[in-house]
């Protein structure tokens, strides 16, 4: 057992295995089995290059042998800092086979985050691309505190070339499926990311259950446009869930319609995952591709129902709304849900074994239909962050529920609607303002492409409300925006005190709106 990892209680782990929720097999073995069953099929496509399952298995096992030869042992941590390229898939597969733990960093992470991840995880190795997106990751490797091995895909210079690491016929270790398979990162906008340990048992279940929810099998062709280090593109069913099924994973780092639409048609893509801003980009492209074969999962940020309807009409695709946290819980709409549920809610929990409660500040259930914090536990929601006892005391209840921090309402039918964040409530003159509620209304204005609302300290009101807007092109007067919000029925105290146009909203490496930066901008503009 890895020191600092919080496992599920033994009685629950036994029950999950007895009922077949957990298979009791490590992910590396499950992927290896899929490679044997589908040896001649195409597994991975990227930039015109195609890799079969047989080649994927051969490369992964040879790399696993090489990693073992470098002294990397079971439960050792390796920070993987690669973009959407085949080497990402091969390396993660190899680490799973070797029993080591990938720590999945995002392409946008830099010295602060990577130094923290290496130190906090106790990483023995750091894997990067030589250059990507105009950035030299080797220079970053020189700046962080030393690790035992730096592995570089491409021109390694003084480091170890990832492609040179290999070992044939190296015995692979036995891997305990209850151990962590990989570390995801928390997606908060304050502080450095926390490490989220996902066990082999629970993550294999996520891949199977999300595929079942979307009614996909071995014919699935999944397009990863989000970084594969994100949970959705990784495993919902994502790249690795598709590989477990025998399907095809198509990798790209572009969201441009003129590049993505031909790729979708050429590779007969059936599923992809996007954030609402990308869906808007596609819907506003002026193209009307026939994507009737495509299911688009939309999540990670609020989705305007009008945008969802328009995207479905313009692109011809099916829309499925998802809510998900890297810590576990997933909710989604169903194909047979009424249109208002699909377009206007975040659906119901994925698993019948998810336990979800909506509670007040004292953790007491709120009346049906009222907003409260969503807390959850179940067979794929973690029991604690890695090496974070103080944070675990704050984020988990004594009986094992994870406190999501999300403010939600639940309908009588069980559908969840995210209305904001517990910490994203502005206290203006004693009145509570949900930033999410105001943002949602602002996005319905025809001249507003995106919006973010923050509160900043004020000596008179306690907090003053700032709304940052990304416009579609036409300028709009502040008074017109406020009048529009009044017309939407918002209470007067919810109308933003200040409206600031921006070319784009700042975002964290996890892709979330960076409200810390926006608050600093608001404070500086108020001086």
From Swiss-Prot:
Keywords, in A-Z order: Antibiotic biosynthesis, ATP-binding, Ligase, Nucleotide-binding
- Binding residues annotated for ATP, in chain numbering: 187-188, 300-302, 406, 421, 512
Record-listed substrate binding positions: 230-231, 512
**Molecular function per GO:** acid-thiol ligase activity; ATP binding
Q: Does the keyword Repeat apply?
A: no
The protein's matches in PANTHER family, at most eight in alphabetical order, are given as: LONG-CHAIN-FATTY-ACID--COA LIGASE (PTHR43767), NONRIBOSOMAL PEPTIDE SYNTHASE PES1 (EUROFUNG)-RELATED (PTHR43767:SF1)
The protein here is known as Triostin synthetase I
Lineage at the top is: Bacteria, Bacillati, Actinomycetota, Actinomycetes, Kitasatosporales
């Amino acid at each position: 057992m890895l020191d600092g990892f919080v496992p599920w209680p033994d009685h629950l782990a036994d029950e999950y295995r007895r009922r077949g929720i957990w298979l009791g097999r490590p992910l590396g073995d499950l992927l290896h089995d899929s490679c044997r069953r589908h040896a001649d099929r195409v597994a991975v496509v990227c930039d015109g290059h195609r890799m079969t399952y047989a080649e994927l298995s051969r490369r992964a096992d040879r790399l696993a042998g090489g990693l073992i030869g470098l002294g990397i042992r079971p439960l050792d941590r390796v920070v993987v800092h690669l973009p959407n390229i085949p080497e990402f898939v091969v390396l993660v597969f190899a680490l799973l086979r070797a029993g080591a733990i990938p720590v999945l960093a995002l392409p946008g992470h830099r010295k602060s985050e990577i130094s923290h991840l290496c130190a906090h995880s106790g990483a023995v190795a750091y894997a990067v691309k030589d250059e990507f997106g105009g950035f030299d990751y080797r220079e970053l490797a020189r700046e962080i505190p030393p690790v035992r091995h730096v592995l570089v895909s491409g021109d390694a210079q003084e480091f170890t070339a990832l492609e040179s690491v290999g070992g044939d016929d190296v015995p692979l270790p036995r891997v305990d499926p209850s151990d962590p398979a990989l570390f995801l990162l928390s997606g908060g906008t304050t502080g450095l990311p926390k490490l989220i340990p996902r066990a082999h048992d629970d993550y294999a279940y996520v891949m199977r259950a999300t595929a079942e929810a979307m009614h996909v099998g071995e014919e699935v062709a999944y397009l990863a446009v989000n970084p594969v280090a994100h949970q959705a593109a990784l495993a919902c069913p994502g790249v690795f869930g598709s590989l477990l099924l025998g399907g095809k994973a198509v990798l790209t780092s572009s969201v441009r319609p003129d590049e993505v639409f031909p790729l979708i048609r050429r590779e007969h893509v059936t599923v992809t995952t996007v954030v609402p801003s990308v869906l808007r980009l596609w819907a506003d492209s002026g193209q009307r591709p026939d994507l009737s074969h495509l299911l688009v999962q939309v999540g990670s940020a609020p989705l305007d129902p009008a945008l969802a309807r328009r995207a479905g009409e313009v692109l011809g695709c099916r829309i499925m709304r998802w809510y998900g946290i890297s810590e576990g819980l997933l909710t989604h709409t169903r194909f047979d849900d009424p249109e208002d549920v699909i377009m206007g809610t975040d659906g119901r929990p994925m698993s019948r074994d998810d336990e979800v409660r909506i509670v007040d500040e004292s953790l007491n259930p709120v009346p049906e239909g009222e907003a409260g914090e969503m807390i959850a536990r179940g067979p794929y929601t973690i029991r604690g962050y890695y090496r974070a006892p103080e944070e675990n005391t704050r984020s988990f209840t004594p009986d094992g529920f994870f406190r999501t921090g999300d403010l939600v309402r639940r309908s009588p039918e069980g559908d969840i609607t995210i209305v904001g964040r517990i910490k994203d409530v502005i206290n203006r003159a004693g009145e509570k303002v949900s930033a999410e509620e105001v943002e949602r209304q602002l996005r319905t204005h025809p001249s507003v492409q995106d919006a973010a609302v923050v509160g900043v300290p004020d000596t008179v009101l306690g907090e003053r409300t700032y709304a940052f807007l990304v416009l579609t092109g036409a300028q709009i007067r502040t008074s017109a925006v406020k009048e529009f919000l009044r017309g939407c029925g918002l209470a007067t105290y919810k109308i933003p005190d200040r409206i600031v146009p921006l070319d784009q909203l700042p975002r964290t490496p996890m892709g979330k709106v960076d409200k810390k930066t926006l608050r600093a901008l608001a404070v500086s503009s108020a001086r």
